[in-house]
Structures are given as C-alpha cells and as structure tokens.
C-alpha cells in the first residue's frame, strides 16, 4: 500500500500562493458634487470613521487572520480626471497579488492597460479598462504601512 506521505497533496510546498489574481476589494470610489459634505454625512448618519480621503475599512485576512487588511471608501470631486478615460460615476479598486505577472497576463489577453505600474510605500498600482469601459484600479497592497500610520478606521 502506498504511503500517504508520498501523495502529491501531502508533498505540496507550504509556500505562499503567488498566482496573479484578484484577492479582494481594495476600494470603492465615486464622483460626488461635494465630497466633504458626503464624507461628513456618511460619518454622522452611518457611523463611518472619516478622514480627508473618505473612510478606511479595517478587516482581517481570511487566510492569515493575524494580518489586518484595508479597504478605502472615497467620494471624489465630480470633475475628477482620476477616473479617465472612463466616463462612469465610479471606480472599483481590486486588491491583487503578483501585479507584474497579472499585468503580463492581461496584456496577453488583450486588456487595455491605462498606465504603468506605480510603486508607493503602501503598495503598487496600475489601471486597466474592462470590456464595458469601466476604469479599474489594481492594487498590490502593503497593509502594514496603514497599520503603522494608525488613525481611526471603520470596523
């Protein structure tokens, strides 16, 4: 009888999954006639922890519960160019892993890549267009930077 330790399932490496893919939602961005008043309204009426950019939501990583992750909710000025070339009223930010390989895969699949990958202390970003003309922000986060910054979060 074959030893269970010799099965492929038993011999899989314990290394982190690096498959280029979306791992969750990183942000919800939308146009607003008055972002400041909108933030204040959501804070007052719905209890969101508000800062100058919107509200940072804090949650635990399902695969690594010791890790705190973040999602940003943010109203933008109605005339913002940040959503361009999309004409839509919103933009979704997706948390991703292995952003370089993901962009390579997207290019191979004919997806429009709007800009180059940009790197900041809190992660890497790139923007793409989906098939319906929605601009999508992809973010490979470094959540520990937000944790170190402190500040109030929506939980």
Which residues does each PLM region occupy?
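Glycine-centered structural positions embedded in regular secondary structure
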Residues: 1-3, 71-72
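Vicinal oxygen chelate
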Residues: 2-33, 53, 80-155
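Core segments of cupin and vicinal oxygen chelate
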Residues: 19-23, 29-74, 108, 126
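Short linear motifs in intrinsically disordered
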Residues: 46-49, 93-95, 115-118
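Solvent-exposed, flexible loop/coil residues
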Residues: 61-63, 94, 150
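Short acidic (Asp/Glu) patches
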Residues: 77
């Amino acid at each position: 009888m074959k030893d269970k330790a010799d099965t492929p399932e038993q011999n899989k490496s314990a290394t982190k999954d690096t498959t280029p893919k979306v791992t969750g939602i990183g942000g919800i961005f939308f146009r607003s006639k008055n972002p400041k008043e909108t933030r204040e309204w959501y804070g007052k009426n719905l209890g969101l922890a508000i800062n100058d950019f919107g509200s940072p939501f804090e949650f635990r990583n399902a695969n690594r519960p010791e890790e705190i992750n973040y999602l940003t909710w943010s109203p933008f000025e109605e005339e913002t160019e940040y959503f361009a070339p999309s004409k839509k009223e919103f933009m979704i930010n997706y948390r991703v892993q292995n952003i370089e390989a993901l962009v390579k895969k997207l290019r191979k699949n004919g997806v429009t890549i709007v800009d180059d990958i940009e790197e900041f202390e809190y992660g890497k970003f790139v923007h793409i267009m989906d098939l319906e003309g929605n601009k999508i922000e992809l973010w490979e986060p470094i959540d520990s930077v937000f944790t170190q910054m402190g500040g109030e979060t929506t939980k």
